[in-house]
Amino acid sequence: MARNPFRMFPGDLPYYMGTISFTSVVPVDPSQRNPTTSLREMVTTGLIFNPNLTGEQLREYSFSPLVSMGRKAIFADYEGPQRIIHVTIRGRSAEPKTPSEALIMMEKAVRGAFAVPDWVAREYSDPLPHGITHVGDLGFPIGSVHALKMALDTLKIHVPRGVGVPGYEGLCGTTTIKAPRQYRLLTTGVFTKKDLKRTLPEPFFSRFFNQTPEVCAIKTGKNPFSTEIWCMTLGGDSPAPERNEPRNPHSLQDWARLGVMETCLRMSRRGLGSRHHPYHSL
């Protein structure tokens, strides 16, 4: 699996801009068990050769995609099974940007993330966003009308308010969640702080989490036993240590926040409604 783009590595641009996420489908190829590597390379190629970005902008900004597989899906108008794919792209910049500047740049990057053939664009009933149609392998391959509709319906751009601060390395953890017996087919593999805000009471949320909506968990895998594996992330309060220096231990409050996020994530994936709030009594 590709490296986690929610962690900082040496050489990464320091300032975090936001994330682009969408869900689509690709045909199931029996000879290729894990297509995430090739799909990630296609998305990266489409972002690099995006006609809306100049060479100077490509040096000033970086976009790191993460591709994970979902469950299989069968459509009535298509022969053969297909695989649901979740794509998340994280953007960074060399200089601090305002939220409006970051949003404009993320919208430009979206136009290079898809590879839509002409016949799919012609058969699609609704108008396409400007500049999103590209012919060839430059971007995520859209091979059918329902794949394009799914990608556009689930397309989200997350730009936090505090994009002018360095993206310090935060606390990461994984959790395994049993999939519910019945749930909607088109489910995005992203869990945001907006979802936390809907689950937690306002005083509790304000005391433990920032108000900026950003991605805090993403589904990274699904095993044959109908369970999902999610990677949860929390922004760090202090910069990451330099090389060969000891790491600063995370506080007990950070570990408590990670546990709260895991509980809310489990509730969301099991389909519990707004009446189930285990933290309202605190």
From Swiss-Prot:
Effect on the protein of changing L265P: Loss of antiapoptotic function
Motif (BC-box-like): 251-260
Superkingdom, natural source: Viruses
UniProt KW keywords: Activator, Early protein, Host nucleus, Host-virus interaction, Ubl conjugation pathway
Compartment(s) where it occurs, according to its Swiss-Prot or TrEMBL record: Host nucleus
GO CC terms in record: host cell nucleus
Subunit-level organization: Interacts with host HDAC1. Interacts with host E1-activating enzyme (SAE1/UBA2 heterodimer). Interacts with host retinoblastoma protein. Seems to form a complex with host E4F1 and HDAC1. Seems to form complexes with either CUL2-elongin BC complex-RBX1 or CUL5-elongin BC complex-RBX1. Interacts with TCEB1/Elongin-C, CUL2 and CUL5 in vitro.
Domain text: The BC-box-like motif could mediate the interaction with host cullin RING ubiquitin ligases.
Physiological role: Early protein essential for viral replication. Strong and global transcriptional activator of both viral and cellular genes. Activates transcription by blocking host retinoblastoma protein (RB) and inhibiting the SUMO pathway. Inhibition of host RB leads to the activation of E2F1-dependent transcription and, in particular, of E2F1-regulated S-phase genes. Stimulation of progression from G1 to S phase allows the virus to efficiently use the cellular DNA replicating machinery to achieve viral genome replication.
Protein name: Protein GAM-1
